[in-house]
Amino acid sequence: MVTTLSYTERASHPSPLAKRLFSLMESKKTNLCASVDVRTTEELLKLVDTLGPYICLLKTHIDIIDDFSMESTVAPLLELSKEHNFLIFEDRKFADIGNTVKAQYAGGAFKIAQWADITNAHGVTGRGIVKGLKEAAQETTDEPRGLLMLAELSSKGSFAHGTYTEETVEIAKTDKDFCIGFIAQRDMGGREDGFDWIIMTPGVGLDDKGDSLGQQYRTVDEVVSGGCDIIIVGRGLFGKGRDPTVEGERYRKAGWDAYLKRYSAQ
């Protein structure tokens, strides 16, 4: 059964990161995550500054930024996150053994654990991936970090369903503080065992139904009523012919109204 608790009630979460996220969602009245996949630092920062007031979370693919640097990309991005009060989710989709992901998360060119509040991982390599990522976070920063497991995807033909999804949920159960939830298309349960997982859902659109590369879109009401806590929207916010200011408020309101409808159903 989908939870009808308010974000304020859920801010008693055992994870400091989840607690912070629920609190800012309530204070800003938004459950919108902007997925900003652009190729330059200038485009990224400009869009984030515009969308910042409407979002609780920014989702990045930092490895597609052609002119990336910690100084010119990450530093100003962190300043914008403070100015507009949102968290940062690096959509890295880790998928290797624990020792390897530990190095990938903490080091390399992107040093993700230093600046991203949240990251995510596939469950294909087993439980060691959670341990490796958590160790990297603890050894890199004193700031709280959170992990989302990829339980389901929005792309046509995805293998992330059935037994794979069930096993991924079992992996998430191994760490109540660090594993804060899932990338999924619906509620993942767990409340009977004391878990309050955050469900973030990609492939959400108010207008389009899909694209030529297999993306499939569902409506805001559809995903939130099914258990989604945070809607992830990309091209719907800033695609060709769209005004990010107008679309940011449009999706913020749609997401918040859908949440209030679910909450009022208790």
UniProtKB/Swiss-Prot annotation:
Q: What GO molecular-function term can you cite, just one?
A: orotidine-5'-phosphate decarboxylase activity
User: From its record, what is one biological process in GO terms?
Assistant: 'de novo' UMP biosynthetic process
Name of the protein this chain belongs to: Orotidine 5'-phosphate decarboxylase
- Span-the-membrane segments of this chain are none
A Pfam family found in this protein is: OMPdecase
Catalytic site positions: 93 (proton donor)
PROSITE patterns listed in its UniProt record = OMPDECASE
GO cellular component, alphabetical, reads:
cytosol
Please report which protein family the annotation says this sequence is part of: Belongs to the OMP decarboxylase family.
Associated pathway: Pyrimidine metabolism; UMP biosynthesis via de novo pathway; UMP from orotate: step 2/2
Catalysed reaction, written as an equation: orotidine 5'-phosphate + H(+) = UMP + CO2
Q: What is its EC number?
A: 4.1.1.23
Q: Which UniProt keywords apply?
A: Decarboxylase, Lyase, Pyrimidine biosynthesis
Q: Which domain of life is it from?
A: Eukaryota
Enzyme's top EC category: lyase
Native organism is Cyberlindnera jadinii
Q: Where substrate is bound, by residue?
A: 37, 59-61, 91-100, 217, 235
